[in-house]
UniProtKB/Swiss-Prot annotation:
The lineage of its organism: Eukaryota, Amoebozoa, Evosea, Eumycetozoa, Dictyostelia. Disulfide bonds: none annotated. The gene is mcee. Its EC number is 5.1.99.1. GO terms for molecular function: metal ion binding; methylmalonyl-CoA epimerase activity. It catalyses: (R)-methylmalonyl-CoA = (S)-methylmalonyl-CoA. GO terms for cellular component: mitochondrion. It is found in: Mitochondrion. It comes from Dictyostelium discoideum (Social amoeba). This is Methylmalonyl-CoA epimerase, mitochondrial. It comes from the Eukaryota.
Length: 166
């Protein structure tokens, strides 16, 4: 299902010239970068404790303790679900990208989706060769201790997509 979602997003992206027949360029890119499962959906929240309580008390979900991600300017909390996770994001520090998001969306909302890939460096190289915009093509260590990059929303139909190495 998520491979189809990404295929549809990439097919509709202005950054690609596409062939919708079998063996399409987009299908080949997806295969080349080794997209795996949906790792998490990230939600920016203006009130971290309130959001933690919501998922714990209303849905009975396992909720982690908050962790400050100094390098990324966010505090993260992971909500464990049966087949994926929700990452709650709250601003941390003076230069938090989440602060800007919350200025535009004061009550919070979906910030990004995260998909797993086999090899982050190979995925970056392949996507750059196909003119997909990557916010910073140098992988950084993400909240799970694994390398990540973010694909620019302008290349992904308005969706910020995080790729995380399996």
């Amino acid at each position: 299902m998520f491979k189809q979602l990404i295929k549809t997003t990439l097919t509709n992206s202005r950054s690609f010239s596409t062939n919708t027949g079998s063996g399409s360029k987009i299908g080949n890119i997806i295969g080349k970068i080794g997209i795996g499962k949906l790792n998490h959906v990230a939600i920016a929240t203006p009130n971290l404790q309130e959001s933690m309580d919501l998922y714990k008390n209303v849905f009975g979900a396992d909720v982690s303790e908050p962790v400050n991600q100094v390098e990324h300017g966010v505090t993260t909390v992971f909500v464990g679900l049966e087949n994926t996770k929700i990452e709650l994001l709250h601003p941390f520090g003076d230069k938090s990208p989440i602060e800007n998001f919350l200025k535009k969306n004061p009550s919070g909302g979906i910030h990004h989706i995260c998909l797993e890939v086999d090899d982050i460096h190979h995925a970056v190289k392949t996507l750059l060769a196909e003119n997909v915009r990557i916010i910073d093509p140098t992988p950084k260590i993400g909240a799970h201790g694994k390398p990540v990059v973010f694909l620019h929303p302008k290349s992904m139909n308005g969706v910020l997509v995080e790729l995380e190495e399996k």
